[in-house]
């Protein structure tokens, strides 16, 4: 309802403009946007909060009238935000659930690791710093090596060692299932927003 009212209010201004309309409205499809703004070049995007520090993930899909040059201009404008991936629109809600909502899940993980560090005697600030840097470095290992996360995990686990004991504790707590459930719940909610 609010989107329809906004489209009505802005319609005249947008009609007279040669601008590219960029939407980051979660769950609002290109089809709906093109119906509200007929004849306009539209890009649908979804950034995540780490874009604010240049390490984000931003998804982009083009409407039927948007040209490659429109997408390229947007990519150049937003290059400082982090990685940009042009994807099929059918992936947008799932990609948003993983990378758009994922930072909240990552922050919870960093906080939980820091809490564990505090329980083991580390000062809070140091435990948080170590957990955050570990997550940053681990993410870079995945991106730069191209190795499967399972292999990278196994590389850290020595037989009978402390890491495999911690992995066992996470498996007993259904860590992976909880992460998958979080993404699925976010995806279902996003689909319902449109």
Set out the residue ranges of the language-model regions:
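Hydrophobic alpha-helical segments typical of transmembrane helices
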Residues: 2, 29-32, 105, 113, ...
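Glycine/serine-rich anion-binding loops at beta->alpha junctions
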Residues: 46-51, 96-106
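NAD(P)-dependent Rossmann-like dehydrogenase/reductase catalytic/cofactor-binding core
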Residues: 132-194
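Rossmann-like NAD(P)(H) cofactor-binding subdomain of soluble oxidoreductases
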Residues: 1-60
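Short pre-catalytic strand/loop immediately N-terminal to key active-site residues, enriched for Gly-Thr
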Residues: 42, 92-97, 149-154
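Internal alpha-helical scaffold of NAD(P)-dependent oxidoreductase catalytic cores
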Residues: 32-41, 57-95, 107-144, 189
């Amino acid at each position: 309802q609010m989107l329809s009212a906004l489209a009505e209010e802005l319609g005249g201004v947008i009609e007279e403009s040669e601008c590219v309309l960029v939407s980051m409205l979660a769950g609002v499809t290109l089809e709906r946007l093109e119906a509200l703004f007929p004849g306009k070049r539209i890009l649908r995007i979804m950034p995540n909060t780490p874009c604010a520090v240049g390490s984000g993930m931003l998804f982009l899909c083009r409407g039927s009238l948007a040209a490659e040059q429109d997408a390229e201009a947007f990519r150049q404008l937003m290059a400082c935000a982090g990685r940009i991936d042009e994807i099929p629109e059918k992936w947008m809600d799932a990609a948003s659930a993983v990378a758009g909502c994922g930072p909240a899940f990552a922050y919870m993980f960093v906080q939980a690791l820091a809490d564990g560090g505090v329980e083991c005697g580390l000062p809070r600030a140091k435990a948080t710093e170590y957990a955050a840097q570990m997550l940053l470095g681990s993410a870079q290992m995945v991106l730069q090596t191209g190795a499967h996360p399972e292999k990278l995990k196994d590389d850290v686990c020595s037989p009978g060692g402390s890491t495999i004991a911690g992995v066992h504790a996470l498996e007993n707590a259904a860590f992976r299932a909880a992460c998958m459930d979080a993404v699925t719940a976010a995806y279902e909610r996003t689909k319902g927003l449109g």
